[in-house]
Amino acid sequence: MPTVLVTGFDPFENEPVNPSWEAVRTLDGQGIAGADIVTRQLPTVFGESIRVLDRLLMSLRPDVVIAVGQAGGRAEMAIERVAINVDDARIADNAGRQPIDTAIVAGGPAAYFSTLPIKAIVHELRAAGVPASVSQTAGTFVCNHVFYGLMHAIAHHGLHARGGFIHIPYLPAQAAGHPGQPSMAHDTVVAGLRIAIETTLRRQEDIREAGGQLH
């Protein structure tokens, strides 16, 4: 039976919760499309987050890995296309670290692309009434750090897994503390993650559908 590892983060930047972990942990132990779902929390800390993820990858040997993170200000589930090899933190992480213009992996590739069927996921999410889009940037904070670290590990540690990253909006309770910022209900995010998992397990190839942006 396939194993799907889904990760979320602990809260950061003085938020009381992180919607990624609140949604992800709901799926732990469930069976989706014939696969076992395993969920784990990652620390919002440069370096340590990748080390924790690496240990999980080596012990679980999952078939699919979907990392999920909070993106306050976004209004949709953002299915990330690419991870870039740079840390450039606008704020400090949960350990007080704030790397600037630093390679995640010295001498590593400039970028890695998601191996999830990102456009098919967006298509299925929209069909189910969940706002979603392909995102062209995962930022340069710990989310991109983990996304890059995940894809680098898959490429270099002999893992036969597909992987990628999904950003999600604030929860409504969080958005109440950030007037004017969009949010997405917990149940909608959980349903969206189930769709993303199901679509990934069902499709080995992505669909051809416009998902780019002009700027």
Curated annotation (Swiss-Prot):
Superkingdom per UniProt: Bacteria
Catalytic class of the enzyme: hydrolase
Coiled-coil ranges (or none): none
Disulfide bonds: none
Cell compartments where the protein resides: Cytoplasm
Catalytic activity of the protein: Release of an N-terminal pyroglutamyl group from a polypeptide, the second amino acid generally not being Pro
Main localization of the protein described in the UniProt heading: cytoplasm
Active site: E80, C143, H167
InterPro entries: Peptidase_C15, Peptidase_C15-like, Peptidase_C15-like_sf, PGP-I_bact-type, PGPEP1_Cys_AS
Keywords assigned by UniProt, alphabetized: Cytoplasm, Hydrolase, Protease, Thiol protease
One GO CC term, this protein: cytosol
PROSITE patterns noted in UniProt: PYRASE_CYS
SUPFAM superfamilies documented for this protein: Pyrrolidone carboxyl peptidase (pyroglutamate aminopeptidase)
Gene Ontology biological process: proteolysis
UniProt GO molecular function: pyroglutamyl-peptidase activity
Recorded family membership: Belongs to the peptidase C15 family.
NCBIfam families documented for this protein: PRK13197.1 (NF009676), pyro_pdase (TIGR00504)
Assembly description: Homotetramer.
Role of this protein: Removes 5-oxoproline from various penultimate amino acid residues except L-proline.
Name the record gives this protein: Pyrrolidone-carboxylate peptidase 1
UniProt organism field: Ralstonia nicotianae (strain ATCC BAA-1114 / GMI1000) (Ralstonia solanacearum)
